[in-house]
Amino acid sequence: MTRPPIPADGAKELRRARAAGFNLFLAVGLFSAAVNLLMLTGPLFMLQVYDRVLASRSVETLTALFLLVVFLFLMMGVVDLARNRITQRIAARFMDQLEGRVFTAALREGAVSGNEAMATASGLRDLDSVQRFIGSPVLLAIFDLPWAPLFLAAVYMFHPLLGVVATIGGLILIVTTITNRMMSKAPLQNASIAAGQAQRMADLYRDEGEVISALGMRGATYTRWRKARNEAQEQAVKGADVSSGFTVFSRSFRLFLQSAMLAAGAYLVLRQEVTPGAMIASSIMMGRALAPVEQLVGGWALVQAAQDGWDRLARLLSRQPPDRDLTPLPRPQAHIDVRQLSVIPPGQNAATVRGVSFALAPGQAMGVIGPSGAGKTTLARALIGAWPVAAGSIRMGGATLDQFNPDVLGNLIGYLPQQVTLFDGTIADNIARLSPEPDPDRVVRAAQAAAAHQMILDLPNGYDTRISQTSGRLSGGQIQRIGLARALYPDPVLLVLDEPNSNLDNQGSEALNQAIRRVKAQGGAVIIMAHRPAAINECELLLVMEQGMRRAFGPRDQVLKEMVQNSAQILKSQEAGRAGGVT
């Protein structure tokens, strides 16, 4: 399976974040050099004890060597602890540098794909996979790996035969690592993909739990989720079987190799070609030389997860480049000018809005009507900047939407979607769009404009009522009003409402009309996607869409009159046809 090419822009961005910790990586490298040099303490102590202390029977020499070893091992422990702590800080810094960028990119990706929560969670999981690898002992094993030749060279210095045994053993472990990577890569990748699909399915079923219970679908949904989960588990078990098999082999082979080294050393001692101390020291040095390889084999799943996460992050960051540094623009007037607009929904090849043009002046409201599938919601998502423009332009105050900073644009536009989602937090937090420093006066004014103020005060804790605890007791109309209040916060230039009265009663519809009149009176513009005639009572203009195109546009009453006349002419023609025998 060939790995697809990694986009250059995203990879460069990741490498820059990694390079920001270059000095810390350099420190880890220096400390790793010190640790590996101090690792020679044990073998050299063994060599001196067997070859000098036992031969001379000198307690003073043994005491001096032992005190030196205690000091050197203490220093090794301090240095090893330092490099472990440094890698943890490198991992934390890497996360700090990229988490905001990844979060924003994943949100934009989710807005395009229609699933913000899943895209955001996936991007942050990939970043977490890379962070776990950077802070893991596996990374330290990579730093230790270049020092393996030093220990092998020391073994060769004792005797070439011992060096050959150690080299052959090392080559076998390296081949084991490469084979492990090749054979476990596909199952681990498939397991990750299948697990993600099962998790997305579980999240969807959780969110739709009320419908599932009401329609008696619990058994069916469990069966479908369990099938997806079983597939993920099957791939995970397959990958674990392969990886664990190589891990067990490498561990067992390393133990065997130590015995083989002792046997070869004993043979050379019998031939009086090496000393007993050299036999023991060479066995320890070989174990130290092969330890990083064995650690890489055992932690290969972590390496694979980090590599896959790195690749996915590179693609995500390439698809969603960072925001440009834009010149701040003054607050625009509500002059909305849409010219020859075409929009292609994400994941599709055909435009569902084609060549639509219209214009609004400050203080005007426009209704958009048409049958289901006419492109009303697509138009709404393009107007708020959530979906990109394929052709044509959308201008607000003379500037296209992409000339505004996204966060600034969000404060200039109020949006009420068909399905209102309230976030974890208080009602005030939701109305203030989760702002860290909300304006309480504007929150209350927005709620009053949406006729939600008294309704909120009637809740257990008023504006401080937490949505996560009470969302099950909020009706669709209450959620709709809170969503409308959020759309009116802080003071939008353009208000886009998609089926705003779908969950409102007569009182709520009247409150909606009052909110529309308020926005118009303040010089704003309002665009309403509607099915019900009551939703366009406050509209001066009317846009009729059919199959993604503009069928009619103009003053509301004139457009409605023309539609009635056209309908009457069609009916008259049909009746005349039937009278003449035409079928």
Indicate residue ranges for each PLM-predicted region.
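Juxtamembrane loop-to-helix connectors within ABC transporter transmembrane domains
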Residues: 46, 105-150
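Transmembrane helix-loop-helix hairpins at lipid-water interfaces of multipass membrane proteins
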Residues: 25-82, 86, 156-161, 272-276
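Helix-to-loop junction immediately C-terminal to a conserved catalytic motif
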Residues: 384
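An intracellular "coupling" helix at the cytosolic face of ABC transporter transmembrane type-1 domains
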Residues: 15, 19-22, 111, 122-134, ...
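Transmembrane helices of ABC transporter permease
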Residues: 65-72, 140-190, 263-274, 291
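Cytosolic ends of transmembrane helices, especially the final helix of ABC transmembrane type-1 domains
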Residues: 88, 194, 217, 241, ...
